[in-house]
Swiss-Prot record:
This is Manganese-dependent ADP-ribose/CDP-alcohol diphosphatase. Monomer. InterPro entries: Calcineurin-like_PHP_ApaH, Metallo-depent_PP-like, MPP_ADPRM. Belongs to the ADPRibase-Mn family. The keyword Hydrolase applies. Pfam families: Metallophos. Transmembrane segments: none annotated. One of its GO terms (molecular function) is CDP-glycerol diphosphatase activity. It catalyses: CDP-choline + H2O = phosphocholine + CMP + 2 H(+); ADP-D-ribose + H2O = D-ribose 5-phosphate + AMP + 2 H(+); CDP-glycerol + H2O = sn-glycerol 3-phosphate + CMP + 2 H(+). Zn(2+) 2 binds at residues 72, 107, 226, 263.
């Protein structure tokens, strides 16, 4: 197996409990290349090639138990009459993987299709229209997938109470007429923009119950969200609206070892004051032709090891005792 020391991969004498594939922000669209609002090039048609290479690599490794897609499966600039076609085109590539893929949606997904439709298309393992869930690939570990747009101005019908409440929240937090603009907001307050969202009260209660159960079972928990939840791991403007509330629940327990996210395309890694690792994954969308950003994570009893390809950085995440 692989290990990382100062960014150098070398053989490890231990076998992992299991491994899983990771990819974030494919944001496919059948449109010419463009740039982000920060001027970073975006390769809309090439991003699906990154996914194809990821799936091919995972299948060749034979030991990848499942994969996780961290959201934004297609881009907001995708022509709306092609949204369904584009989502299906990307999902067809995920279907070529030899194991299951667990999905979450991001803001770009919600620019294209309503929440209920996405829950169905992405085959989220829930018994309702909710987009948060948990699963346990082995007795020692549990994965918790959050819906970072549960409380959001995106994805809900315009006349839905959540939409009205979220817009009221943004009016209070962001004085700009363009609620996607963080101009004038300072520090972590820059997160109060429309392209972000938060975890609602019911989901927070569910999260508490899941972590309580995981603690009783002595499971390590890996928390997954489209939106990052630590200021050290991402741009302030990319953070979840109520990351502080989520982390307050996390800190009541000692079972959460790492939080993974997408959304902030440059990626990042931090360890918070309670020893929890936060790893924001580099985006597939911003890979020039011939380059890639995906990886797999080897899971051990006492650490996680992200083995990245190309633009996705290798990261060793050792747990505190």
């Amino acid at each position: 197996m692989m290990a990382v020391t100062n960014g150098v991969i070398h053989a490890s004498s231990r076998e992992p409990l299991f491994s899983f594939g990771v990819i974030a922000d494919v944001q496919y669209a059948d449109i010419p290349d463009g740039r982000s609002f920060l001027g970073v090039p975006r390769y809309y048609r090439h991003s699906i090639s990154v996914l194809q290479r990821a799936v091919s690599t995972w299948n060749k490794q034979h030991n990848i138990k499942f994969s996780i897609n961290f959201g934004d499966i297609i881009d907001g600039y995708c022509p709306k009459d092609k949204s369904l076609w584009a989502v299906q085109k990307v999902l067809d590539e995920f279907e070529k993987f030899d194991g299951p893929t667990y999905h979450m949606f991001g803001n770009h997904c919600l620019y294209n299709l309503p929440r209920g439709k996405l829950v169905s298309l992405l085959k989220m393992p829930t018994d309702s229209d909710r987009a948060y869930y948990d699963f346990s690939p082995c007795p020692e570990y549990r994965f918790v997938v959050l819906d970072a747009y549960d409380f959001s101005a995106l994805g809900w019908p315009r006349d839905h109470p959540v939409t009205a409440e979220a817009m009221k929240f943004l009016e209070e937090k962001n004085p700009n007429s363009d609620k996607n603009s963080p101009d004038g907001l300072v520090g972590v307050d820059r997160r109060f923009v429309m392209f972000n969202g938060g975890v609602g009260k019911e989901q927070l209660s569910w999260l508490n119950d899941v972590l309580q159960d995981a603690s009783a079972r002595r499971q390590n928990v890996i928390l997954c969200s489209h939106l990052p939840m630590d200021p050290g791991s991402a741009s302030f403007a990319a953070l979840m609206w109520n990351y502080d509330e989520v982390m307050a629940i996390v800190r009541q327990y000692k079972c959460v070892k790492a939080c993974f996210a997408g959304h902030d395309h440059k990626g990042g890694h931090s360890v918070d004051s309670h020893g929890v690792h936060h790893r924001t994954l580099e985006a597939a969308l911003e890979c020039p032709p011939g380059t890639s950003a995906f990886g797999h994570i080897e899971v051990y009893p006492d650490k996680l090891l992200l083995v990245g390809s190309d633009k996705m950085a290798d990261t060793e995440m050792c747990f505190e005792p």
